């Protein structure tokens, strides 16, 4: 049994090399898996499930093809695609999961998430996140004409890039105490997440319990895939062709 985990692809029309790598992954690796988990930021930005552009259709078709072949696909919203919702999932056969979800992997409880909720030292981001996740605000935004939403998102992108330049690397990483709190709350000793773009496996001890946190990588310069096979988790890279 093979299970695959990916995140932080940031797919967009202006980075065709990432899209090509992703489509190759779907056709040659994902097709042989039992399950595929996408832990957020599949897209650079997702402005709504009514986006029927040729680019979004290309990505939708890749998932539809995969799910039609019997691969179970799951998605957790990231900070760039939190508007990806039920319509997209219905069209593609993907199952939308809660922000924090515990799954069963060969009898072992594993907590999966995007990871942005763990970065609690970034207070301004957490305040922004709380605002944009309000259902009433999303309801209003989704009813704004698509071309206006595109303009709004472009302005938000520019502001995010500007603010990031003034943030320290530490404030954009997870807060260890929050990691431990959430893992204890969910009753797990293994956590898998993305968001920070710092692929690694972290081991630590809490109250004599061995804990593990696996961080997925981004797809800016190569693909990053976490595989589970033969009772082992392995972080792999996939080169751009």
UniProtKB/Swiss-Prot annotation:
<comment type="similarity">
    <text>Belongs to the LpxH family.</text>
</comment>
<feature type="binding site">
    <location>
        <position position="10"/>
    </location>
    <ligand>
        <name>Mn(2+) 1</name>
    </ligand>
</feature>
<keyword id="KW-0464">Manganese</keyword>
<feature type="binding site">
    <location>
        <position position="195"/>
    </location>
    <ligand>
        <name>Mn(2+) 2</name>
    </ligand>
</feature>
<keyword id="KW-0441">Lipid A biosynthesis</keyword>
<feature type="binding site">
    <location>
        <position position="8"/>
    </location>
    <ligand>
        <name>Mn(2+) 1</name>
    </ligand>
</feature>
<dbReference type="GO" id="GO:0005737">
    <property type="term" value="C:cytoplasm"/>
</dbReference>
<dbReference type="GO" id="GO:0008758">
    <property type="term" value="F:UDP-2,3-diacylglucosamine hydrolase activity"/>
</dbReference>
<keyword id="KW-0472">Membrane</keyword>
<dbReference type="InterPro" id="IPR004843">
    <property type="entry name" value="Calcineurin-like_PHP_ApaH"/>
</dbReference>
<dbReference type="GO" id="GO:0030145">
    <property type="term" value="F:manganese ion binding"/>
</dbReference>
<feature type="binding site">
    <location>
        <position position="164"/>
    </location>
    <ligand>
        <name>substrate</name>
    </ligand>
</feature>
<comment type="function">
    <text>Hydrolyzes the pyrophosphate bond of UDP-2,3-diacylglucosamine to yield 2,3-diacylglucosamine 1-phosphate (lipid X) and UMP by catalyzing the attack of water at the alpha-P atom. Involved in the biosynthesis of lipid A, a phosphorylated glycolipid that anchors the lipopolysaccharide to the outer membrane of the cell.</text>
</comment>
<keyword id="KW-0444">Lipid biosynthesis</keyword>
<dbReference type="Pfam" id="PF00149">
    <property type="entry name" value="Metallophos"/>
</dbReference>
<feature type="binding site">
    <location>
        <position position="167"/>
    </location>
    <ligand>
        <name>substrate</name>
    </ligand>
</feature>
<feature type="binding site">
    <location>
        <position position="41"/>
    </location>
    <ligand>
        <name>Mn(2+) 2</name>
    </ligand>
</feature>
<keyword id="KW-0997">Cell inner membrane</keyword>
<feature type="binding site">
    <location>
        <position position="79"/>
    </location>
    <ligand>
        <name>Mn(2+) 2</name>
    </ligand>
</feature>
<dbReference type="InterPro" id="IPR029052">
    <property type="entry name" value="Metallo-depent_PP-like"/>
</dbReference>
<feature type="binding site">
    <location>
        <position position="197"/>
    </location>
    <ligand>
        <name>Mn(2+) 1</name>
    </ligand>
</feature>
<protein>
    <recommendedName>
        <fullName>UDP-2,3-diacylglucosamine hydrolase</fullName>
        <ecNumber>3.6.1.54</ecNumber>
    </recommendedName>
</protein>
<keyword id="KW-0378">Hydrolase</keyword>
<comment type="pathway">
    <text>Glycolipid biosynthesis; lipid IV(A) biosynthesis; lipid IV(A) from (3R)-3-hydroxytetradecanoyl-[acyl-carrier-protein] and UDP-N-acetyl-alpha-D-glucosamine: step 4/6.</text>
</comment>
<keyword id="KW-0479">Metal-binding</keyword>
<dbReference type="GO" id="GO:0019897">
    <property type="term" value="C:extrinsic component of plasma membrane"/>
</dbReference>
<feature type="binding site">
    <location>
        <position position="122"/>
    </location>
    <ligand>
        <name>substrate</name>
    </ligand>
</feature>
<keyword id="KW-0443">Lipid metabolism</keyword>
<feature type="binding site">
    <location>
        <position position="41"/>
    </location>
    <ligand>
        <name>Mn(2+) 1</name>
    </ligand>
</feature>
<feature type="binding site">
    <location>
        <position position="114"/>
    </location>
    <ligand>
        <name>Mn(2+) 2</name>
    </ligand>
</feature>
<keyword id="KW-1003">Cell membrane</keyword>
<dbReference type="GO" id="GO:0009245">
    <property type="term" value="P:lipid A biosynthetic process"/>
</dbReference>
<feature type="binding site">
    <location>
        <begin position="79"/>
        <end position="80"/>
    </location>
    <ligand>
        <name>substrate</name>
    </ligand>
</feature>
<feature type="binding site">
    <location>
        <position position="195"/>
    </location>
    <ligand>
        <name>substrate</name>
    </ligand>
</feature>
<dbReference type="InterPro" id="IPR010138">
    <property type="entry name" value="UDP-diacylglucosamine_Hdrlase"/>
</dbReference>
<dbReference type="InterPro" id="IPR043461">
    <property type="entry name" value="LpxH-like"/>
</dbReference>
């Amino acid at each position: 049994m093979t299970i695959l985990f990916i995140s932080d692809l940031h797919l967009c029309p202006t980075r065709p090399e990432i899209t090509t790598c992703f489509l190759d992954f779907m056709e040659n690796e994902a097709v042989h898996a039992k399950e595929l988990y996408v832990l957020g930021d599949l897209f650079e930005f997702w402005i709504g499930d009514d986006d029927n552009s040729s680019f979004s259709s290309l990505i939708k078709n890749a998932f539809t093809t995969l799910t039609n072949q019997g691969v179970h696909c799951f998605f957790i919203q990231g900070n760039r695609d939190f508007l990806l919702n039920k319509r997209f999932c219905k069209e593609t056969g993907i199952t939308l999961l809660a922000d924090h979800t515990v799954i069963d992997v060969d009898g072992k409880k594993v907590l999966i998430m995007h990871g942005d909720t763990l970065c609690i030292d970034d207070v301004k981001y957490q305040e922004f996140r709380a605002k944009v996740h309000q259902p009433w605000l999303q309801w209003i935004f989704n009813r704004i004409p698509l071309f206006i939403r595109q303009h709004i998102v472009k302005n938000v992108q520019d502001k995010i890039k500007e603010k990031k330049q003034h943030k320290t690397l530490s404030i954009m990483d997870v807060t260890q105490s929050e990691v431990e709190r959430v893992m204890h709350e969910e009753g797990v000793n293994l956590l898998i997440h993305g968001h920070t773009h710092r692929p690694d496996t972290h081991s630590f001890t809490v109250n004599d319990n061995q804990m593990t946190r696996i961080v997925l990588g981004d797809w800016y310069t190569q693909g990053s895939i976490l595989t589970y096979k033969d009772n082992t988790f392995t972080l792999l890279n996939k080169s751009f062709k």
